[in-house]
């Protein structure tokens, strides 16, 4: 069977969220770059893959998927179902909870920091809006307090097993490490240990190697 095709840019943490899971699941895939400066993400052929003209999009044979977390779940179901814990009702429910936490709590606090510190200088030649950064750092710290409490009870977010919920944090947190605020994790020893453990995995190292924002 032909490898899956992941369309997008490896500087997008939504794309590399999928890479973390594809790598961890041992899936066969290739990355098909899109040139945003040429509007390739809005071209008809890409709109056929993702009708919103965004990335990522995944092609597996005649199946086209979009939305990064949906892609991640599909890859797990196909290649490594244990990352979803679908065989256990309670464990799979906790995976779902923490994937939702990443989507609705962690990433909304993190994304404005990444935009201000990485995207704004790179794309617009403008300095970060420090007020926006500080406001969202405070939001992120509140989220990390919840993570710290959770990780005192188990090694990973859903339990004592790695899951798609952990892997979904990798790309964004790698980008956090490229900002002046990487040390925010240091105040939370269990979060820091969890992150160190994640970054020792080959899947996370692959993501880090692909995501190299300009200095």
Curated annotation (Swiss-Prot):
Keyword Secreted attached: no
Example GO molecular function: glutathione transferase activity
Descriptive protein name: Probable glutathione S-transferase GSTF2
Tissues in which the UniProt entry reports expression: Constitutively expressed in roots. Expressed in anthers, callus, panicles, sheaths and stems (at protein level).
Domain of life: Eukaryota
UniProt key word Calcium: no
EC numbers: 2.5.1.18
Annotated ranges, domain GST C-terminal: 88-215
Induction context: By the herbicide safener fenclorim. By drought stress.
Known catalytic reactions: RX + glutathione = an S-substituted glutathione + a halide anion + H(+)
Organism: Oryza sativa subsp. japonica
Binding annotation for glutathione: 12, 41-42, 54-55, 67-68
Alphabetical UniProt keywords: Transferase
Residues of the GST N-terminal domain: 2-83
PANTHER family linked: GLUTATHIONE S-TRANSFERASE GSTF2-RELATED, GLUTATHIONE S-TRANSFERASE RHO
Example GO biological process: glutathione metabolic process
GO cellular component: cytoplasm
Function as written in the Swiss-Prot or TrEMBL entry: Conjugation of reduced glutathione to a wide number of exogenous and endogenous hydrophobic electrophiles.
A Pfam family that the UniProt record links to this protein: GST_C
Residue ranges the record marks as coiled coil: none
């Amino acid at each position: 069977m032909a490898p899956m095709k992941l369309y997008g840019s490896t500087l997008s943490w939504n794309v590399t969220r999928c890479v973390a899971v594809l790598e961890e699941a041992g899936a066969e895939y290739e990355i098909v770059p899109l040139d945003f400066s040429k509007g390739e993400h809005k071209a008809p052929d890409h709109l056929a893959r993702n009708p919103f003209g965004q990335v990522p999009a995944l092609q597996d044979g005649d199946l086209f998927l979009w939305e990064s977390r949906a892609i991640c779940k599909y890859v797990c179901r196909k290649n490594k179902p244990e990352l979803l814990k679908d065989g256990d009702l309670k464990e799979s429910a906790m995976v779902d909870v923490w994937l939702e936490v990443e989507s609705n709590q962690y990433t909304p606090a993190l994304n404005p920091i990444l935009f201000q510190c990485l995207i704004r200088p790179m794309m617009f030649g403008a300095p970060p809006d420090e007020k926006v950064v500080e406001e969202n750092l405070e939001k992120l710290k509140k989220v990390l307090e919840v993570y710290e409490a959770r990780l005192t009870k188990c090694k990973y977010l859903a339990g004592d097993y790695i899951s798609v919920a952990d892997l979904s944090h990798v790309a964004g947190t790698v980008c956090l490490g490229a900002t002046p605020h990487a040390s925010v994790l240091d105040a939370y020893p269990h979060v820091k240990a969890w992150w160190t453990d994640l970054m020792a995995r080959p899947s996370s190292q692959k993501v880090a190697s692909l995501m190299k924002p300009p200095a």
